[in-house]
């Protein structure tokens, strides 16, 4: 790509499916086990300014093993290495940890190779996106076009018991380190196993571009003013700056004010960032504006969150802070969590109560733990009310109970690209 760029051909690459990389995607050593050097780090971020955070083969934001205090960390986890039945190592495979590790490298005066933005993708091989739970036919029509093939309902006939016994015999005769789990028995029923049941109906890439042209869209990707959703077409804005006030959330020109006085998703700022009215004191905490609108064909929003990561002398740290709650509820300042809003799903027909959420949420949040000398990143996460997962829709249409080891419901979401704070 660098050679092409010298010839006037501009391009970028978007790494994907890091969750299934077994720690290879964001490792801190090269192929020979040597520590990353600055030349490699610069090449990496120059050519890979954005990464895929969600797609059909699972979501790569974070993992419960890596983010044990994040109640939403287990969203659509595909635990396997890509195209195998072997488990993928979480460390080095998820983007939030990579953001943290990149800051730690930067703390040592090295270029941060992982200061990237986020997009979502589909990665289906069926000539169609698969980002709607109620109309999901999975990745490969020939291999996962039916509910039984997808593993959401039991296999019957020869494909069931006979397929299970055949798999057991094959695994005994020819054991593989990559695993053999094409069938699984649960409560007496035989289901398709492996990674397919863990696939998600995801995702979408969104860009804030000045116009719908190749040049403008590419520029948005290059400056990382992009975000991802797990499928619904939510609209998300995220800004950081100094001197923001709450009137900007409702002002007709609030977005223009935010651009003028700060940086948008994907950007960087520092303690001497100008607001247009001069420099700001190092002790001033920045403000963060989050605005989100729900997809009217999906579910209402439940909460807005800001995910913060930072590095200090003790290492890297992360936190998840609710900043806006549905229905005008207030965040509990002791827990940084919204109260439960009563959203529920009727598993018998997947109906929801749309009155329990909000179709639009916005907030201005000031970081009470901000330290001017401390590197940090911030990104917005938008959480919908619960809705049925695709596997539950399959079970309803087939007339069987939902598969017990799969989540019956999910909370669709969106992620902004991170904004990085860099000390002077």
Which role fits each region the language model picked out?
Residues 5-11, 17-424:
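C-terminal functional module detector
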């Amino acid at each position: 790509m660098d050679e092409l760029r010298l010839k006037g051909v501009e391009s970028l690459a978007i790494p994907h499916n890091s969750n299934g990389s077994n720690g290879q995607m964001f490792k801190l050593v090269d192929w020979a086990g040597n520590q990353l050097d600055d030349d490699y780090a610069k090449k990496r971020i120059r050519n890979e300014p954005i990464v895929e955070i969600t797609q059909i083969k699972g979501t790569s934001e974070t993992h419960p093993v890596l983010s044990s205090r994040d109640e939403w960390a287990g969203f659509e986890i595909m635990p396997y290495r890509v195209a195998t039945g072997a488990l993928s190592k979480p460390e080095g495979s998820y983007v939030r940890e990579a953001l943290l590790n990149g800051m730690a490298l930067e703390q040592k005066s090295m270029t941060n190779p992982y200061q990237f933005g986020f997009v979502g993708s589909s990665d289906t091989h069926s000539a169609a996106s698969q980002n709607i739970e109620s109309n999901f036919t999975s990745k490969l029509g020939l291999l996962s076009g039916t509910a039984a093939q997808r593993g959401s309902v039991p296999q019957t006939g020869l494909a069931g018991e006979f397929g299970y016994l055949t798999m057991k015999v094959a695994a005994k005769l020819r054991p593989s380190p990559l695993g053999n789990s094409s069938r699984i028995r649960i409560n007496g029923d035989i289901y398709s196993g492996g990674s397919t049941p863990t696939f998600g109906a995801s995702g979408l890439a969104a860009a804030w571009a000045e116009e719908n042209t190749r040049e403008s869209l590419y520029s948005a990707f290059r400056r990382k003013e992009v975000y991802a959703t797990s499928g619904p077409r939510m609209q998300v804005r995220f800004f950081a700056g100094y001197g923001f006030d709450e009137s900007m959330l409702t002002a007709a020109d609030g977005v223009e004010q935010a651009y003028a006085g700060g940086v948008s998703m994907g950007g960087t700022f520092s303690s001497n960032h100008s607001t247009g009215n001069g420099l700001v004191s190092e002790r001033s905490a920045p403000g963060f504006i989050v605005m989100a609108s729900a997809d009217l064909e999906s579910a209402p929003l439940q909460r807005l969150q800001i995910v913060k990561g930072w590095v200090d002398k003790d290492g890297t740290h992360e936190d998840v802070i609710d900043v806006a709650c549905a229905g005008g509820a207030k965040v509990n300042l002791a827990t940084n969590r919204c109260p439960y809003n009563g959203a529920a799903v009727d598993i018998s027909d997947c109906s929801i109560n749309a009155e329990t959420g909000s179709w639009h949420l916005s907030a201005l949040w000031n970081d009470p733990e901000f330290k001017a000398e401390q590197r940090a990143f911030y990104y917005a996460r938008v959480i919908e009310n619960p809705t049925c997962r695709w596997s539950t829709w399959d079970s309803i249409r087939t007339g069987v109970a939902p598969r017990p080891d799969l989540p019956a419901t999910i909370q669709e979401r969106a992620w902004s690209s991170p904004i990085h704070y860099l000390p002077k």
